[in-house]
Curated annotation (Swiss-Prot):
Pfam families: GHMP_kinases_N. Pathway: Isoprenoid biosynthesis; isopentenyl diphosphate biosynthesis via mevalonate pathway; isopentenyl diphosphate from (R)-mevalonate: step 2/3. Belongs to the GHMP kinase family. Mevalonate kinase subfamily. The keyword Transcription does not apply. This is Phosphomevalonate kinase. It catalyses: (R)-5-phosphomevalonate + ATP = (R)-5-diphosphomevalonate + ADP. GO terms for cellular component: peroxisome. InterPro entries: Erg8, GHMP_kinase_C_sf, GHMP_kinase_N_dom, Phosphomevalonate_kinase, Ribosomal_Su5_D2-typ_SF, Ribsml_uS5_D2-typ_fold_subgr. Induction: Expression is regulated by the transcription factor NRG1.
Length: 432
């Protein structure tokens, strides 16, 4: 019997760069653009186990893995390389150590927000519940929009595989899903990232503080030095308490998040490595900037929390006063931008480059705009803007009326969706 799952994309609103250190909090919003996986067990007449994965929205989107060992990396039969799928299968099987042969088919879908929408054809499922864009090119040739597609992919494939071997794991132990996906994502990337994107894919909108990187680093060293011990150490790590923060959160009532795609593009790893180099070379200077940024981030989170609490205790007054009570939140966002501008200037890395400063300043002039930032590591490719819900239509219209003035920003069709990984109905994907 088939099972289906989905995991959200992310918008990283506060905590860029600081999130790499386990002393700082970050604020990450889960988005309505989701990655999907439908898993179906086939017959088990095979002598060796097999996992077939397809991504029908992209050309050549098929990978077939024959599994001869639970402790070796899977090999794709046509030598097609997909490091994220390989890593996920490898970590799941090393953890589960299945003793019986299995034959699994996984079909992956991604919502339109993850990729450029040029040269696409729309397809809708038989019951009308799901609609996806089909591309004429291979996935490696289609531009991504920076919503966390690799973290979403690893999370949803890990969830579907784990759910096959451990029924109901999604409802009984999300920490297992998170820990497996986090390890697999790091293994695929060959580095221990901050992990906020995987954490958001599993848990949803969160205030996040990272785990100690040594947790995963140590188990990878075991894999290199003593591979036979790896499954045992991996099991221990996945079952352990990582002591990281993932507090559920949500944007306040009446405030909407808009994600603006700006034709540009900047490679996140290059930005991050340059900032880390500056931090190493100028510890005192960087410490001042980090403190300034952290203070602004915490103020931003405090304002959001207080607005949510105010709505919960007295919704009527909150709604009545909302238009006039956003100023402290606007100030907090401006202070985050000042911190990012200082980081840009001191490190000489284009985190909030001049063109983005200009665009965000112009958005700020439109009635109903609470404030905007360059999300995540910053750069040229996106902006995230908070707008009063009753002004969203007018806000978008203003940017469309004068596209050159607003740098031809394209508002991606998505919104906050606070839930993390979810079980879906398999019938919603029939006919795609």
């Amino acid at each position: 019997m088939s099972k289906a799952f989905s995991a959200p994309g992310k918008a990283f609103l506060a905590g860029g760069y600081l999130v790499l250190e386990p002393i700082y909090d970050a604020y990450v919003t889960a988005l309505s653009s989701r990655m999907h996986a439908v898993i179906t067990p086939k017959g088990t007449s095979l002598k060796e186990s097999r996992i077939k994965i397809s991504s029908p929205q992209f050309a050549n989107g098929e990978w077939e893995y024959h599994i001869s060992s639970n402790t070796e990396k899977p090999k794709e039969v046509q030598s097609r390389i997909n490091p994220f799928l390989e890593a996920t299968i490898f970590i799941v099987l090393a953890y589960i150590q299945p003793t019986e042969a299995f034959d699994l088919e996984i079909i992956i879908y991604s919502d339109p927000g993850y990729h450029s929408q040029e040269d696409t054809e729309t397809k809708t499922s038989s019951n009308g519940e799901k609609t996806f864009l089909y591309h004429s090119r291979a996935i490696t040739e289609v531009e991504k929009t920076g919503l966390g597609s690799s973290a979403g992919l690893v999370s949803v494939v890990a969830t579907s595989l784990l759910s096959h071997f451990i029924p109901n794991v999604i409802s009984t132990n999300k920490d297992i899903l998170h820990n497996v996906a986090q390890i697999a994502h790091c293994y695929a990337q060959k580095k221990i990232g901050s992990g906020f994107d995987v954490a958001t894919a599993i848990y949803g909108s969160i205030v996040y503080r990272r785990f100690q990187p040594a947790l995963i680093n140590d188990v990878f060293q075991v894999l290199e030095s003593d591979p036979e011990k790896f499954p045992t150490e991996l099991k221990k790590l996945i079952a352990s308490n990582w002591e990281f923060k993932h507090e559920r959160c949500t944007l306040p009532h009446g405030i909407k998040l808009l994600m603006g795609d700006v034709k540009g593009g900047s490679e996140t790893p290059k930005l991050v490595s340059r900032v880390l180099q500056w931090k190493k070379e100028k510890p005192e200077e960087s410490s001042v900037v980090y403190d300034q940024l952290n203070s602004a981030n915490l103020q931003f989170m405090k304002e959001l929390r207080e607005m949510r609490e105010k709505y919960d205790s007295d919704p009527e007054t909150y709604i009545k006063e909302l238009d006039h009570s956003i100023e402290p939140l606007t100030v907090a966002i401006k202070n985050i931008r000042k911190g990012l501008q200082a980081l840009t200037q001191k490190s000489e890395v284009p985190i909030e480059p001049d063109v983005q400063t200009q665009l965000l300043d112009r958005c700020q002039e439109i009635p109903g705009c609470v404030g905007g930032v360059v999300p995540g590591a910053g750069g040229y490719d996106a902006i995230a803007v908070l707008v009063l819900e009753n002004q969203v239509g007018n806000f978008k219209q203003k940017t469309l009326e004068n596209p050159d003035y607003f740098h031809n920003v394209y508002w991606v069709d998505l919104e906050e969706q606070t839930e993390g990984v979810l079980e879906e109905k398999p019938e919603d994907y029939i006919g795609l």
